[in-house]
């Protein structure tokens, strides 16, 4: 039986990279566990950052962090522009979020993840000068049907017609923020239900694009780093996404323009990450709709991760048992 025509492009170093990245997110998630429900989000974040940094330093790639923990003078590790990896292997852009949902972790709530997104060097949008992004995410049915500039009611009706799913059965994920009060009212007035997220909009965006979930759409203003990470994931999921940078004030707008960003442009997937040579890995810190959180089972620590590869359009789940004595 002949191999698929695209198979020769799947190089072994690229395939192996996925498992190396999983080890980094697993380590970050495990190290955050002692801080779940303890009320100290900064301590949880530091533990995850420290663990991820160590593991990334051993990976066979030449990585540059495009989206990290902060500017070089504000974050000692995993800062924007930092080089990670051992310098061999593919040259990559990297987005890291050692904990997407530090508040969720500190409060012991669901949907906290440790996330890494990787793409070929020079393909990932550097949106670090603007903290927020307005976005809309759906499954593949959204292409040519919904648009960021359309009213939410029009988008819901269009997606309902495209999918054959009644609006009354549709669910829209939105961050539960005061800025979204009008948006939430409009969604409900159109007849759809809402899934209000306190944090962690990477999981919300991914679930909106995945087949067979309860989420049909994810909308609203969230973090621009989370937006770029979600875009990388959608390269594997085949979903639809648009975004627009949302500067919080005139100073941030000026900073974005100085960085060469068009803050008024509606960004398509290829504007956020070009090409399909992407990986996204996410390990659960706390339980959620995407993956289970870290669990202690006697002498074993169990982690669950999801691995999404854009080039092959493949989504895998990795369940790993770690000997607790090696970690605690």
Go through each PLM region and give its residues.
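A short glycine/serine-rich beta->alpha loop
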Residues: 15-18, 39, 103, 142-144, ...
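DPxDG-like acidic metal-binding loop motif
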Residues: 89-100, 104-125
């Amino acid at each position: 039986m002949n191999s698929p025509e695209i198979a020769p492009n799947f190089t072994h170093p690229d395939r192996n990279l996925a498992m190396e990245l999983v080890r980094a997110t697993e380590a970050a998630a495990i190290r955050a566990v002692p801080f779940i429900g303890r009320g100290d989000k900064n301590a949880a974040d530091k533990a995850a950052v420290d663990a991820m940094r160590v593991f990334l330093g051993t990976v066979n790639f030449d990585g540059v962090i495009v989206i990290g923990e902060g500017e070089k003078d504000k974050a000692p590790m995993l800062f924007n522009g930092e080089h990670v990896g051992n310098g061999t292997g593919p040259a990559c852009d990297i987005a890291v979020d050692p904990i997407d949902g530090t508040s969720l972790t500190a409060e012991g709530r669901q949907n906290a993840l440790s996330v890494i997104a990787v793409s070929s060097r020079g393909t990932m949008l550097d949106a670090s000068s603007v903290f927020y992004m307005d976005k809309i995410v759906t499954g593949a049915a959204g292409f040519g049907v919904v648009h960021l500039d359309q009213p939410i009611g029009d988008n819901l009706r269009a997606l309902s017609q495209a999918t054959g799913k009644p609006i009354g059965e549709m669910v829209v994920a939105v961050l539960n923020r005061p800025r979204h009060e009008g948006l939430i009212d409009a969604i409900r007035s159109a007849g759809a239900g809402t899934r209000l997220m306190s944090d962690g909009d990477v999981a919300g965006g991914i679930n909106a694009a995945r087949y067979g979930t309860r989420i049909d759409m994810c909308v609203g203003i969230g973090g621009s780093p989370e937006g770029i990470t979600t875009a990388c994931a959608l390269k594997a999921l085949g979903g639809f996404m648009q975004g627009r940078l949302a500067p919080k004030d005139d100073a941030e707008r000026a900073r974005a323009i100085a960085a060469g960003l068009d803050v008024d442009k509606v960004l398509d997937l290829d504007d956020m990450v070009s090409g399909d040579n992407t990986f996204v890995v996410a390990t659960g810190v706390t339980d959620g709709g995407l993956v289970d959180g870290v669990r202690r089972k006697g002498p074993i620590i169990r982690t669950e991760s999801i691995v999404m590869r854009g080039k092959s359009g493949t989504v895998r789940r990795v369940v790993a048992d770690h000997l607790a004595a090696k970690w605690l």
